[in-house]
């Protein structure tokens, strides 16, 4: 049977046994990929510095998803939060990866069994003896089971009643750890950044799924609805399933890109909007101001800023800075962060504190401009020296570092001042090791960016797939060329197009 590549799935159209087989094989491939990818990532992951070289800087993709569900330890003796773990237990990263691979193998064998033994009694209609599936009943079964899984996840896993809980952190991604979460049943449960909403929504959605599943198991659809929505056609199942998948893909693309409790910044990196809004910068300044109010010196106040918080306030961690076709992790771009040099404070010869204008997300280059507290331009690095009025040399700008490795160090040499002014455009200044990975200095996106791009792209593709298969199943009779209102006796083979008397075959 010479089928073109885009029609090969017709072989399982009226073959329930082998339809089940290919879906089990698909599950085997998905689970096998997940387990294998996890083992690969564990082989290349360096857990030694969770602050300056976290998983998202190293381009890990599946490890963050395991971590947000409660896995933090490795059989290698390390924990993702730092420190040694003497007894990680069976549900370590490797344990979960191994479970997926074993499950994949079992699904592989089950797929082969169902391919060979395709003509099972369960798939035949006792009235006609032909293979058929009771699709409304199958829908009810799947809805019920999905509801049980959803309810169980929210009521047991997330709450810690029987399970580890989930990854929970503070708004600035500093204190993250796996912990149990109480369901949020009030209006706060609708805040996308409240972890309690994850528990309550899974419990509520699971309950609804269980009830809806029982309804569809006990109530048959009306005949007109059954025929109108083509409920007996397997392509209807395909169309509506694609709709569910593309809708979910659009939703998770949004929660990933804009941020939510389900996508912690410690696991996936910060969002671009946190750079755009100066989110971490404001928190750093708030902490410094609080320190100064307690009679700390500038040096003491800046030294108390966590390195982790300062690192978030660096444009190289902005997922929107990576180009679409720049492959590799963030570490392959600007390098592996080694240490925070400290916060540079610039002053002119009159003693005014100057602030470097930060580079907006979608700029590759940006003029170096220093403004005072009122936003008035006081210094810059000019493009044309002949016309300059505010050059670092003319204004006499100096820089002094507070906190970090250069704490207390000051520079007045114009070349050095300009170097640090350029780097201050990019947020807090870090020492970056480009030699180890031969990093090219060009920014890369984080797994947050890849996930969003991938899911948004496939959601769009699947949206068109839903329209395509929905149209095929709703208008199958039209596409087949049979007019449902045709009263005349139709002789198969008499016309080139079935039922069209204008295309009567010529007898030679």
Swiss-Prot record:
Superkingdom of origin organism: Eukaryota
InterPro entries, per the entry: PS_antenna-like (IPR000932), PS_II_antenna-like_sf (IPR036001), PSII_PsbB (IPR017486)
Keywords assigned: Chlorophyll, Chloroplast, Chromophore, Membrane, Photosynthesis, Photosystem II, Plastid, Thylakoid, Transmembrane, Transmembrane helix
Entry function: One of the components of the core complex of photosystem II (PSII). It binds chlorophyll and helps catalyze the primary light-induced photochemical processes of PSII. PSII is a light-driven water:plastoquinone oxidoreductase, using light energy to abstract electrons from H(2)O, generating O(2) and a proton gradient subsequently used for ATP formation.
Spans traversing the lipid bilayer: 21-36, 101-115, 140-156, 203-218, 237-252, 457-472
Annotated compartments: Plastid, Chloroplast thylakoid membrane
SUPFAM superfamilies to which the protein is assigned, alphabetical: Photosystem II antenna protein-like
Similarity-based family: Belongs to the PsbB/PsbC family. PsbB subfamily.
Keyword Secreted: no
Gene3D superfamilies: Photosystem II CP47 reaction center protein
Pfam families given in the database record: PSII
Lineage: Eukaryota, Viridiplantae, Streptophyta, Embryophyta, Tracheophyta
Primary location recorded for the protein, binned into one broad class: plastid
Listed PANTHER family: PHOTOSYSTEM II CP43 REACTION CENTER PROTEIN (PTHR33180), PHOTOSYSTEM II CP47 REACTION CENTER PROTEIN (PTHR33180:SF35)
Protein name: Photosystem II CP47 reaction center protein
Membrane topology summary: Multi-pass membrane protein
GO biological process, one term: photosynthetic electron transport in photosystem II
Organism: Panax ginseng
Subunit structure: PSII is composed of 1 copy each of membrane proteins PsbA, PsbB, PsbC, PsbD, PsbE, PsbF, PsbH, PsbI, PsbJ, PsbK, PsbL, PsbM, PsbT, PsbX, PsbY, PsbZ, Psb30/Ycf12, at least 3 peripheral proteins of the oxygen-evolving complex and a large number of cofactors. It forms dimeric complexes.
């Amino acid at each position: 049977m010479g089928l073109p590549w885009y029609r090969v799935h017709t072989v399982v159209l009226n073959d329930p046994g082998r339809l089940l087989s290919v879906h089990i094989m698909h599950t085997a491939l998905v689970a096998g990929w997940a387990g294998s990818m996890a083992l690969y990532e564990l082989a290349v992951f360096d857990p030694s510095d969770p602050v300056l070289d976290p998983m998202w800087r190293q381009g890990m993709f599946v490890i963050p998803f395991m971590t947000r569900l409660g896995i933090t330890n490795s059989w290698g003796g390390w924990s993702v939060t730092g420190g040694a773990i003497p007894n990680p237990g069976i549900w370590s990263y490797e344990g979960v990866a191994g479970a997926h691979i074993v499950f994949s193998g079992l699904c592989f064998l089950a797929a082969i069994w169902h391919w060979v033994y395709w003509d099972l009694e369960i798939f035949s209609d006792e009235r006609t003896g032909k293979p058929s599936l009771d699709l409304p009943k199958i829908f009810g079964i799947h809805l019920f089971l999905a509801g049980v899984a959803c309810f169980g996840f929210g009521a047991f896993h997330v709450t810690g009643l029987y399970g580890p809980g989930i990854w929970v952190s503070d708004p600035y991604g500093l204190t993250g750890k796996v912990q149990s979460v109480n369901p949020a049943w009030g209006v706060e449960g609708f805040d996308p950044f409240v972890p309690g909403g994850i528990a309550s929504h899974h419990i509520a959605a699971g309950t609804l799924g269980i009830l809806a599943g029982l309804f569809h198991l006990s109530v048959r659809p009306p005949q007109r609805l059954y025929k109108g929505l083509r409920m007996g056609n397997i392509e209807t199942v395909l169309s509506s399933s694609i709709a569910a998948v593309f809708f979910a893909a659009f939703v998770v693309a949004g929660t990933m890109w804009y941020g939510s409790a389900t996508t912690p910044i410690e696991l996936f990196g910060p969002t671009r909007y946190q750079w755009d809004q100066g989110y971490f910068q404001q928190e750093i300044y708030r902490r410094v101001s609080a320190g100064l109010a307690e009679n700390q010196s500038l040096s003491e106040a800046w030294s108390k800023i966590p390195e982790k918080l300062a690192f978030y306030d660096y444009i190289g961690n902005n997922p929107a800075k990576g180009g679409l076709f720049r492959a590799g992790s963030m570490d392959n771009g600007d390098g592996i962060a080694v240490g925070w040099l400290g916060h540079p404070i610039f002053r002119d010869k009159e003693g005014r504190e100057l602030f470097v204008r930060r580079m907006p997300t979608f700029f590759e280059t940006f003029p170096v401009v220093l403004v005072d507290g009122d936003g008035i331009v006081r210094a810059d690095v000019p493009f044309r020296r002949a016309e300059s009025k505010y050059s670092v040399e003319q204004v006499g700008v100096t820089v002094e570092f507070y906190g970090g490795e250069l704490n207390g160090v000051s520079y007045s040499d114009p070349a050095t001042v300009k170097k640090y002014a350029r780097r201050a455009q990019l947020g807090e200044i870090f020492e970056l090791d480009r030699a180890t990975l031969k990093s090219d200095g060009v920014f890369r996106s984080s797994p947050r960016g890849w996930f969003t791009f991938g899911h948004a792209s496939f959601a769009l593709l699947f949206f068109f797939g839903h329209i395509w298969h929905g149209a095929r199943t709703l208008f199958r009779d039209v596409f087949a060329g049979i007019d449902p209102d045709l009263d005349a006796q139709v002789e198969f083979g008499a016309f080139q197009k079935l039922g069209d008397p204008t295309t009567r075959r010529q007898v030679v």
